[in-house]
Design a protein with these regions (language model features):
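Conserved RNA-binding domains used in RNP assembly and mRNA/RNA metabolism
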Residues: 1-81
Length: 81
């Protein structure tokens, strides 16, 4: 399931990726992760690594949201490149 994650310590950071919730901490796996920097423009996240997934604890996350259709389309295009 493709979702937005907004980080608690930086609510202006929107991460998008394939979200998997796990039973134990770290409780969230975000695969094929990108950061939305402005109106649907995606940047790879994290920077400076080939790793395209991140683990987050439940205390890192402010909220989880569904992306807008236009952003979802851009994400799917970016993942398939």
């Amino acid at each position: 399931v493709i979702k937005f994650i907004i980080l608690k310590n930086n609510p202006d950071t929107y991460l998008i990726g394939k979200l998997t919730e796990m039973d134990e901490e770290p409780s969230i796996l975000l695969e094929d992760s990108f950061r939305v920097v402005e109106e649907g423009l995606l940047k790879v996240y994290p920077l400076h690594t080939e790793q395209r997934f991140i683990f987050l604890t439940s205390t890192d996350v402010l909220t989880i949201l569904d992306p807008a259709p236009a952003v979802l389309a851009e994400y799917q295009k970016a993942v398939n490149e």
